[in-house]
Amino acid sequence: MKQPIEKTFHRNGQLREVVPLRNGRRHGIVRVWHKNGVLANEERYQNGLLNGVCRQWSEAGRLLGEYRMVHGTGVQRTWHENGRLQLEFSTVRGDFSGRYRLWLNDGKLMSEEIYLNGRPVAAEEYRAACAKDKSLPKWTGKAGKPLPNTVATEKHIHEVFVRSLLAQKNRAEVRKWLENGGKAVRSLGRFKRKADALIFVEALYKAGTTEVIAPDIYAGRAGAEFADCLLVRLPKIAAKRRAIRKVCAQLSKRKLGAFQPDKDIGESHLFLSQS
């Protein structure tokens, strides 16, 4: 019997993910591609559990890192595009057990937790469990100091994310990008027509934004281009900031996208996701 394979695609038609299955579980090499066709991830599975060397690459094709798993046991990692560690966590036979840490792309620790058999626990409980079960990852070193849970931290996290998008080379002011495409396809998120996308962008400018940017434009066939998110620059005037959020809220109401942050925290840009 032939092994079933699930495939998904990016909006530009580029293959996104290939997942081989056996008895409904991942079995074989799972591969994920960036929108530009470059291989992004390669993970080896056996009967639903990671088993073997897993690797991650940047959009430019640079190897960001790799790790080895043995039947669902090991330390899994992901990396930011700039090469810094993004996520690190331990699993034992597929269940979270051990330290779970998450970093921003500026290197700051965003969160750190301890898991035991898939649930978060205190350090004391985990150490006691380790004394009884030698298969659990040892707790070594000191606990980190994640960023405090404050509005200032929320703003910092958002601004770091915005800066990473603004650093993209394949960005453009969205109105010019939509209008200068000629007969070639210019597709913005879930808008079915370019004219509808332009109406929305014009509403943002009318509300008071000074710039609407498509930060991650990617190519398709025959000159087609696609964008799945926007950055909306916010003015300092409170009334205009509220008006812009009101326009974005209509987008969410029509199920054409979502925006962040959901409340004003003094951010420089709103992020609109339309994927």
Residues of each region from the PLM?
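Glycine/tyrosine- and acidic-biased, solvent-exposed loop/turn segments at the edges of beta-strands
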Residues: M1-W139
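A general secondary-structure signal for short beta-strands and their flanking turns/coil
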Residues: Q3, E225-A227, E267
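Generic recognition of long tandem-repeat/solenoid scaffolds
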Residues: R26, F96, D228-R233, H269-S273
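Short amphipathic beta-strand and strand-loop transition segments with alternating hydrophobic
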Residues: S90, I213-R221, G257-D262
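Short intrinsically disordered coil segments
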Residues: C130, R245-A249
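Long, contiguous N-terminal structural blocks used for assembly/anchoring
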Residues: S135-P235
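Short, conserved charged micro-motifs
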Residues: I237-K246
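Acidic, proline/glycine-rich low-complexity IDRs
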Residues: A249-S275
